[in-house]
Amino acid sequence: MINMQRAGSGRIAGIATALGGALSNQLGAASGSLAFPGMGPLGVVAVRQLVAAMILLPVVRPRIRDLTRAQWWPVLLLALVFGIMNLTLYLAVERVGLGLAVTLEFCGPLAVALLSTRTRNGAICAAIAAAGVMAITRPQPTTDYLGVGLGLIAACSWAAYILLNRTIGSRIPGVEGTATATGISAVLFLPIGVWILITTRPDMFALLCAVGAGVLASTVPFVADLIALRKIPAHLFGILMSINPVLAAFIGAILLHEELGTIEWVGIALIVAANTAALLLPSGTPRDATAGAGQRRD
């Protein structure tokens, strides 16, 4: 009975953490978009990675010398994914628009949700969530195949981000793995950040917006997602990520005074219904439920 109560409370905490990370991510995305005119997408991504590393490394102080080969490889891959995931999404938005870019990117967590669940309920919830995302974003057809390709790379990166975080969470205690990956990613982007600061000379407003994006869209979600994926299975996390377009729509309506039409509200209702069903309906034993169970040290 005690173990069941602990599992239930852990699941609730994981869901709340994932949703909190998603909210922070969308607030950070809004902040980062305000910096685009001053330093461009590449500059914003570089500053985001640098800010996240400047916060996490001194606080966490990861013991990198103690990491084994089995711990190092997912950390190194995650460091690459951090930058690729954000940069390709921003570049896709520039070429094909926000709606199509976000829809393409959501294919990543959707694939994780579909491939890591063995039940019909999980697959149906994922499909409903996908329909809701399309209703909100309303992607338009395009012949910009490079933009589509960038969106699909962002999708693959998001899927890899989920799976790598789950692996790191089972092999490295605390948030040392995330902090280490963030530091490596920052080193990779440091020359780019310096070059952009010298050549574009962004104003203070753009810098502050980029720094805000680094805190809200990188530091907080990176840690929150790692913690959440220790408490909930990857297929549920993938479905929960469909809440991102909903949060983006609400933030746009509140902060940017954007209007939500009937189709957008239908999309929001579909996503809320899919997430509610995923949380309440029995989902059986997902493929990832026992992954790494014998390796966890924390």
Question: Predicted regions: what is each one?
Answer:
Residues 14, 31, 37-84, 107-112, ...:
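Transmembrane alpha-helices of multi-pass small-molecule transport proteins
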Residues 19-27, 31, 59, 76-91, ...:
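Hydrophobic alpha-helical transmembrane segments of multi-pass membrane transport proteins
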